[in-house]
Amino acid sequence: MKYQNIRVGHFISRPNRFIAKIEIEGAEETVHVKNTGRCAELLVPGAEVYVQDSQQEAEGWLSDNELLQGEMQMAVSSKSTNIGKKRKTRWDLIAVRKGDRLINMDSQIPNKIVKEWLEQEKWTHNLHNQSDRIHGITKIQPEYTYGKSRIDLYVEAQDRKILIEVKGVTLEENGVVRFPDAPSERAVKHVHELKEALKEGYECYVFFVIQMSGVRYFTPNMDTHPEFKEALKEAAEAGVHVVAYDCSVREDEIRIQDPVPVILENPELYELSQVLVPWYQKARRDLPWRHTTDPYRIWVSEIMLQQTRVEAVKRYYARFMEALPNVNALANVEEDKLLKLWEGLGYYNRVRNMQKAARQIMVDYNGTFPKTYEEIQSLTGIGNYTA
């Protein structure tokens, strides 16, 4: 989505939710703020902002009081229509720079770019490790009435009927983006409506448009509105799809870009995993039994590792596997050879019990390693931990 007539300015103040004072080309101007959220972390004195010159579209200007009353009516009705063609300001606030990141703060744009994106059939996201795409779209209807709410988008695609509630996200801290930045009972209501719509066969989505790029993950804002977090979590558990995409943002353009991880609860654990997993991948030891899912080989390694150093086990494990590669081989090997293969590990009763267990498997499970915890625990020499 492209904007026309963009100019750069610097934020001075915000007298109310609907207007801001911006320095543009050396003059202080009154600018329409297209986002009634708090945006306190964005609109700080001196911040570089980008505004749209709407002078060519205006047929008149409103007084300060008319503008405030009109904008308040728009906020209550949640409609995006203009107040006739009269306006008090020639400028609209579009984007703000926060550090090295440019953030689009136009609250009217997320619905538009999602609709545009769907029209181009670009929706591809990973859901439960399977690629899912909305294709074959035959209908897109904005502001769809469902129950007592208006859902942002209704989509028909082949035999699918899809409801999509779109939420713009501008609140960012250390690469983490959150919604909402202020309590929103309307957002909670919409999430509940989507959850109910599942029962009528609709496919439902909450689509978070991250109005910036380069973020790490999205999480609901527990501090600001815990009820929204709980509603979103319950909806997701019921089957509502919760997705987030970041955007490529320029001074005069915004477009949907890449999927962003959605963390609905315990973001601190996700943060920890982002540190520990890379460290583990780099520092972990290369152990042969970690390269297999064969339960027999894992079982042998578990018994060998009991009270024995890991590095010492590696060579014994390789020797044992070469001679006895499967349950059948272990069940039928002569005891002298078996004990010779175990030599150096000690605790010979362990390997004798292993052979007894292997013979149980041959008789009771036709040579196939049992699959359930209870079955495995019933084998000779296998306790709770090993099972």
Go through the PLM ranges and name each one.
Residues 37-50:
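Short nucleic-acid-contacting surface segments enriched for D/E, G, S/T with interspersed K/R
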Residues 16-21:
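Short aromatic-glycine-enriched beta-strand elements
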Residues 211-267:
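Domain-level recognition of nuclease-like catalytic cores that cleave nucleotide substrates
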Residues 167-168, 175-185, 192-224, 246:
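Nucleic-acid nuclease catalytic cores
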Residues 9, 151-180, 194:
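Conserved catalytic cores of phosphodiester-cleaving nucleases, focusing on short active-site segments
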Residues 264-379, 385:
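N-terminal polyanion-binding entry modules of DNA glycosylases/AP lyases
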Residues 52-130:
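Terminal, basic amphipathic appendages of nucleotide-handling enzymes
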Residues 123-146:
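A short acidic/basic microdomain associated with nuclease active sites
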